Amino acid sequence: MALRCPIVSVLGHVDHGKTSLLDKIRRTRVTQREAGGITQHIGASEIPINTIKKVSKDLLGLFKADLSIPGILVIDTPGHEAFTSLRKRGGALADIAILVVDINEGFKPQTIEAINILKQCKTPFVVAANKVDRIPGWNSSEGPFILNFNEKNQHPNAMTEFEIRLYENVIKHLNELGFDADLFSRVKDTTKTINVVPVSAMTGEGVPDLLVIISGLAQRFLEQKLALNVEGYAKGTVLELKEEKGLGKTIDAIIYDGIAKTGDFLVVGNPDGVLVSKIKALLKPKELDEMRDPKDKFKPSKQISAATGVKISAPDLDSVIAGSPLRIVPKNQVEAAKEEVLEEVEEFTILTDDEGIIIKADTMGSLEALANELRKVNAKIKKAEVGDISKKDVIEASSYASTNPLNGLIISFNTKVLADAKAEIEKSDVKLLEGKIIYKLVEEHEEWTKEMEELMKSDEINRLTKPAMIKILPNCIFRQKEPAVCGVEVLYGTLKIGSPIMSEDGKKLGYVKEMRDNQQENIKEAKVGMQVPVSIDGNIVLGRNAKENDILYVEVPEPEARKLHHEFKDELRGDEKEALSRYMELKQKIENNIFWGM
């Protein structure tokens, strides 16, 4: 049975050494040509089996490994967002993953998110415990870790420190996340225990061990998955759309099954459904050369077979988006391929709600991953699209916010904000959350939602009529009417400007027009215990329908009293609760209705 290369994805926290480790394997130096030493784009590299056997020759006999796969195809990802982007029907594009962890720093938030994604996609993985060369006293050298891990080559103190860091920074965290894990040479059952392979991207130590473990695991446990369909048409996923000099727009893609030929037709998903275009050229990088930064030009291929990274030149590719499914077929199979791609695109369709927020992402897979994580925290999504944030998105979000402020949010994963959209955001009430880490965006969404809910609750409470009981102070009637002016003491609750006032027998007396403090400054409210002069405009005539020592109440409309009693009671001070309780008892008596306000 012919086997294809297993597709390997590399995940891990920023600066834990993903690209440097791959560079060591490929003997190229991509990282040094990139800004900040951090992977900026997605790429793919083929590592032929002969290369693996060459660098691992000392280990093949030790592990009794008989490798028959043609090699491995490594997707070099910027963190793990690309892993979620690269999907095929049934889950992740990658057959197996390498999770890179700095053995000295241990697990970081992105490490945990990467593991959660791997669990969700049911993708087997190996842990590369990188930067073993930085363990104090460790004598790191190029070659197999297993041959260097002994007291002949290492000081006992360095061996002890290695064991401590291996357990404390790697194995313990894996255990806490529900995985059995151990140093790869101690693993007895690879179906139940995660292999941890110590490596150094600087010296090359452990790279042979890692290649043997990855190749052996893939061949042993994924044989059925790696069976090559030697007669079927090519199936793949778009990595990214690129402008190439002399070729125009091209697609970088991973082919995971079947065979493709020059002159075949490309059938690929796009926002409108399916695009069909005749292939002009299938271009491949040379072996051990990284797809996004080759030192030599691509070479044209008449035929390619899975698994491989390929650059596709064809007309009219502008609307293609990363993460889209693709097929490469002869003319007589175009219609069947269109149906297949359409079905796969529809699987990516995200169910939306009648109301909610807007989410945008750079690829179909990452949009799906973002939506899934937001659903876990009960977020409602009105619109989910691939692409940059436009002015139209902002206007739509603003209209959603007009009915519910919680809907005035756009979450952008790894996309640009167009200039006119930025200008629109500045003059609108729309909130924009941007980022390249899904879990952080979800956390920020939860924090923003909580803040907004508290603000909305506070606004609503402030709009409600606050309960209060006041007493007209003796010898403090300054004007009888139009408006009446007198001194009052707030017995319970909060007296505010505009509060409607009633007597103990339920008669409407007017509303609070003005209040002053001891310095004769106008104030907007008076709280329990305060004695203040007030003016009351309305039917009140002091000395006639309201007298010294009379108790007056703020008249709270029944719907507002009910809201305060049921929804906002915990937000009221103790004296405000007492004012509300006494007022409701009084109204129940006056209205002869024990359910008033309940």
UniProtKB/Swiss-Prot annotation:
Residues 200-202 are annotated as: G5. GO terms for molecular function: GTP binding; GTPase activity; translation initiation factor activity. The lineage of its organism: Archaea, Methanobacteriati, Methanobacteriota, Methanomada group, Methanococci. GTP binds at residues 12-19, 76-80, 130-133. Pfam families: GTP_EFTU, GTP_EFTU_D4, IF-2. Residues 130-133 are annotated as: G4. Keywords: GTP-binding, Initiation factor, Nucleotide-binding, Protein biosynthesis. This is Probable translation initiation factor IF-2.
